[in-house]
């Protein structure tokens, strides 16, 4: 299981993170987040991952569930479930801690980015969240 966040700034832009070259889906843009560790809830993993990857502090109460996507059954790959949360409040300025490129994107341009397959169906809920600000 994986969690990710739609981080929306006061200008309505969404923070996207580029996957490292040499890894699966390398070079594609994704919502920041990461895998759950044993014993963690999804929201605990999201708060931890955003701190580790972006050096920001997010409170779980400031994150709203937006949707999920999963690898299709029988695709020959292991099952991956991606839980997406929306967040407008955090402390600190996002700075990549793992060398990944970051970019603030106008919400309307999300669908123009090259995204990993699991992120594609989550663009619609991300747009809805970004528009509600």
Predicted regions and their residues:
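Active-site-adjacent beta-strand/loop module that shapes the phosphate/pyrophosphate-binding cleft
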Residues: 9, 67-93, 103
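NUDIX/MutT-family hydrolases
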Residues: 84-86, 94-126
